[in-house]
């Protein structure tokens, strides 16, 4: 069974919800495969995720990992899916006990050392997330003031992958 989290995509200034699904396929060669009409930044996310995860001591899956960005017929551009993909993978492999992971929208590029880098288009993505009915969002700390301009959605500004894990596990995030 796959783990699903959500992010947002932009077409111009209009946003739409993206479902990020992570599944491991046992018995196949170790690799991360990302599908769903992503650009080069999306395709490179696997390398950033692996580096960020190992910085915090998480294990890479021993089998093939498939990450799907849906809807599959709409283009996904940018590196802001990294955080959602990493959290979906950690939850799928039962390395974190994420509570309510499916209720959040995740936006953020991961650095190789696990920091969450700022992104462009956060205001439009949070606006679209609220319009889609989402109540919780995680964005890079540097984008928090921009994201908080949108009412009706609770937004957390985080600095690292580990802070996101703590939030999802119900541990205090300072």
Question: Predicted regions span which residues?
Answer:
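Peripheral, non-AAA+ core regions of ATP-driven protein-machinery
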Residues: 1-174
